[in-house]
Amino acid sequence: LTAFVIPVKTGIQNHRKGLDSRFRGNDRLCYSVTMDNNNMKWLVGWAIYLPMLLMFRNGNRMGRRPAHPTYLKKILLTILVFSLMRMIPCLNAEASSNSLTLNEKDTGYRGIWYMNQPSGDEYVYKYSGGLGTYCAKHKPFAVYCDKVKKTFFCYGGTTTDSDRKLLHMVSYYDHKTGMVPRPTILLDKKTNDAHDNPVITVDDQGYIWIFSTSHGTSRPSYVHSSTWPYDVNEFDQVNVTKIENSQEVPITNFSYMQPWYLKGKGFVCFFTRYNYPADRTICFMTSNDGVKWSQWLRLAAMDQGHYQISTASENKAGTAFNYHPKGKGLNWRTNLYYIETEDLGKTWNCADGRKLTLPLTEPASPSLVHDYQGEGLNVYLKDIRFDTDEKPVILFITSKGYESGPKNDPRTWTTARWTGTAWQIRPAFTSDNNYDMGSLYIEDDGTWRIISPTETGPQPYNPGGEIAMWLSGNLGQTWKKVKQLTKESPRNHTYARRPVNAHPDFYAIWADGHGRKPSESTLYFCDKQGNVYVLPRKMTVDFTKPKLLYEKSNVKY
């Protein structure tokens, strides 16, 4: 049993426990409810209890008040039924192969360890480590909501007995109390692939949306929405659809999802579809309610495809991407492109306003920011932001090749800023791996900030390292490392992610992990001053305060 239909009278305000007014038709409510432990007990229990209650009430109306022992037996029988249902394995979400949505509380915060492409050298893999906040093409991982003073976040977690079984996890940091709850296990993705990590967004009603991505087309993708606003205790699976050939059809697969919620306008999503027709075709779609989505728009399909990173404001959405030249394989990624829309995807243009016809299929496109193919350099995308004038700034690394190790140095962190008339491209600093990933902050006073694992870690030339904070006060012309946030770590720190509307007390979140062998992975976050907090791996209470990793500093940067 995966779904049921309940007739409801038009206009009735339903309890949102599995019944959401946003999914209501004219006179019937059709909503998929995952038959997890709680929903099954609720449904079956009431199906048994209500007839008993009606029997008792009818007896009263007819003047035949049931004898006290009989009434007591009915109560005891009801209690027994509910107790037995708790013990039946097939109704337990952990035991049911048909149950997707778990809605269970975990015992702590544990990130997934993942590797890709063994290299047969001292670095062991092309990339690897604690990748609970991987990858750069997944975003956002966290959203700050001022109304409730909480930063909600998701990550790729794992079980207590494995470092490599991917669970989709959701939690929050309470800025009023400084505490975190036990995280919620949303679902088991049935893989060890961190490319299936979840992403998060929050709509203007406060409902938390989790998009469960897939690496390619071999596994299904899912969408969930929180049962209650600003609450992570329970989620409902949403049966999302798109328009295809003028018909509504289910959405069952997407990759590298990047959902953004625009206040008063709805959702915009950048994502990838494999073999559509390019190996990695980058796409775009919109939705007013998160349920019914527009027709998929192919943005670009040059040669073997692309990776993209996107951003959105109230007025526009933009994406930067590279491309895979034909015949060279997906490890060769080069060039830098940028396009944007100011009307929710109806029209698209370059940064200079020139209109584009999509999909883009030729590498010599007017959207080209810089020709790195001609320089023999790979391009690894990291982050993108709009500045205070809503002009794009792109953060990326260039290197000589895909393999780990010094032979492909320098790995140069670079910014590309649209000035209004031209792209201004400036080197920032270097690190030792193509998959070192950090976030760019453009603050109201004009400060540019990067929080990233640029410092050599315990596993040199593997992804990540020690986290550092860099500042620029002149639009990226020069950078100063103002603080090293971690030091003498046993494992490399990786993928520092910026929350949407980042609050100074929760400014970045990341994970650690060994760069050359499977290991445990711990999650961390830092404040704007660079103080690092550890999310607890084991919790014996429902709420706790994360511990400082080092002595707190009040120096402001």
Could you say what each language-model-derived stretch is?
Residues 97-557:
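Extracellular, repeat-based ectodomains that mediate carbohydrate processing or recognition
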Residues 1-97:
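Intrinsic disorder/low-complexity segments
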